[in-house]
């Protein structure tokens, strides 16, 4: 799949996810350096892939999903980036993020390749949204065409 990053076309690496398929389990790193597995989370999941929490669009995006998550029942919002866990923890504290789980894919890039969001030119994740039901069936996917743009919040939150 192709997206653009600051206007430059980039071919994403990894397996493109489609609605209806079962989402792959993946490994990541929690902010406390502990192991994270998608399979450890029960119920519905909204997975938010971002390039870096330290950018204005990613910052605004995670804040928006954090605010929305306050009203969710039975849905866990997971934000994943290549940021180091220490940076994620610092950013969450400074931004008051307390309803979203942030995890890092820096170590294995497991999520990057299993969900088809790896940007090889910069070593970051593309911006994407995945909504999974309680059985990990994919019910919504958005690979944002321009990585520096916002996702369609309304569609993602309605999914």
Protein language model features and the residues they cover:
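Chalcogenol-based redox active-site neighborhoods
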Residues: 1-159
